[in-house]
Amino acid sequence: MLQALLDSKDFLALTLAHPEQFDGEFSFNLGDHTQVEVWDTGVIVFEPIQNEGKDIVLSCGVHGNETAPIELCNSLIKQLLQQKIIAKQRTLFLIGNPLAINNGTRIIDENMNRLFSGEHSNPPGLVNPERVRAKKLEAYVDRFFTAAADGRQRIHYDLHTAMRASKHEKFAIYPYRPGRAFSGEQIMFLAASGVDTVLFHHEPTTTFSYFSSERYGADAFTIELGKVYPMGQNDMTRFIATHEMFMRLITAKPLELDAFDADKVNLYQVCRVINKHFDDFEFTFATDVENFRSFPKGFVLAREGGQEIKVEHEFESVVFPNAKVPIGNRTVICLIPAVNADVR
């Protein structure tokens, strides 16, 4: 495996050729500047001999059909392996769900991005590939962050694409972080990366980004980089700014960020999450409605169990509507413009 990676510089191809696991860990050096460690299929660490004080996790492919972030990360990995760019920050890349990527599907058995913060081991336990992999991914993040000295900035960008069109093509979800202000610098970094819209979440979740934020104090985000397309059919020119800023971050080049300015970004706060309680749950709007579509107060969003679910605020925007989830799962997130968000 080591020789195959050294020859091809294509970590994604190696991962997809061995989607369940590698035959053990291996490591090698790039020149006299970087140690590379491969911990598992889809798990590769770049450890600069001299680093600048940030620990960065870039994860992709938690959902197997969300291919643009996978191609973006593989491009960065390839450039690092080819020594076209040199890491100056400790960086962990995670290709989340190789089995689903090979299958060309979002999941194999279960939505992995609902299985973190230990949810993978709650009943029914480690009964499917997503649950097993989520537990491993948590362990790799823990190993990576705890191997470095305390006091360093920890960053985790969990990269996705959405199943539907969006009023805001690229947007990020800022996990709930009670007692900690939101980072204006991080929001402006995202804006410079082409991600000009941020949603402030209002409660704990079992997503990958919340896990890193809550457990390790990381500046963590779930980042949606556009719409789902098959592998090889993404217009990668739409990700030039994202690639450039991630490259600058990894190589410790000047980020040249603007000071935080709420007028330069779109800021929303989650006002509620609507979960499914009955099999007859259905939305009143079209199934192909775009993310961030806004509805006025009193509008009937959905019906279930003989009850109507109405818009409660003057206007609410919806993201990730999906009526076909299991009972107990989230059907939609409702948003209002952010008011008095603690951004510093």
UniProtKB/Swiss-Prot annotation:
The active site is at residue 224. Signal peptide: none annotated. GO terms for biological process: arginine catabolic process to glutamate; arginine catabolic process to succinate. It comes from the Bacteria. Gene3D superfamilies: Zn peptidases. Transforms N(2)-succinylglutamate into succinate and glutamate. This is Succinylglutamate desuccinylase.
